Regions:
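Eukaryotic short linear interaction motifs
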Residues: 8-10, 44-46, 88-91, 107-110, ...
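Calponin-homology-like cytoskeleton-binding modules
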Residues: 81-83, 91, 95-102
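RNA substrate-binding interface of SAM-dependent RNA methyltransferases
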Residues: 1-88, 140
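C-terminal folded domains that constitute the principal catalytic or ligand-binding module
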Residues: 96-187
Length: 187
């Protein structure tokens, strides 16, 4: 099973490097690890340097890194670009697909940027089934966002792949700060 992290590096590179470290650590601990590949990961780029600076042993990480685009590595009909703006719900994980997690970290959220990129490339898209399995929290502190960090998306995928349970997977990856909770947690 393949998960490819697209490195769309904007201004928050240290956060992305940290998310890559967390994602990698979660994959190492997973009962069913994924094959990981960082694509468009240019040697000497800011994110490249930041990954080596922030992540001890990064050069020994058991994952592939390449400057190439995922479009050059995989058939387009095998690619599923995960984006919170997709109309398509990810219902299951297909071991014959390559799932793209867009490594976009930017404080000024660009609405539908990952969806737009996937459409421009004529790729299948899907979103995690947050709305289907979770409800909005009534807390006024929460702003109800389905946009997750790449390590959180990975945690959801990994837990689902292990348990085949979306509620368990979403509980593992969607923090309460996103403003969603499982219905049985609503009191």
């Amino acid at each position: 099973l393949h998960v490819t992290v697209l490195v769309i590096c904007w201004k928050e590179t240290s956060r992305l490097a940290s998310q890559i470290r967390r994602l990698y650590g979660a994959n190492r601990r997973a009962e069913k690890p994924f094959w990981l590949c960082l694509t468009e990961f240019a040697v000497g780029s800011l994110i490249y340097k930041e990954c080596f600076r922030m992540n001890d042993g990064f050069s020994s990480y058991l994952m592939d890194t390449t400057q190439e685009s995922y479009l050059d590595l995989f058939p387009s009909d095998a690619i599923v670009y995960l984006t919170p703006d997709s109309e398509n719900v990810l219902e299951d994980i297909d071991p014959n697909k390559v799932y793209i997690l867009g490594g976009l970290v930017d404080e000024s959220i660009h609405k539908k940027l990952t969806l737009q990129r996937a459409r421009e490339q004529s790729l299948q898209t899907a979103r995690l089934p947050i709305r289907e399995y979770m409800v909005k929290s009534l807390s006024s502190k929460n702003y109800h966002s389905e946009t997750l960090a790449i390590n959180q998306v990975f945690d959801v995928l990994s837990k689902y792949y292990e348990t085949r349970s979306w509620p368990a997977a979403l509980k593992a990856g969607v923090s309460s700060g996103k403003g969603y909770m499982l219905p049985d947690a609503v009191k």
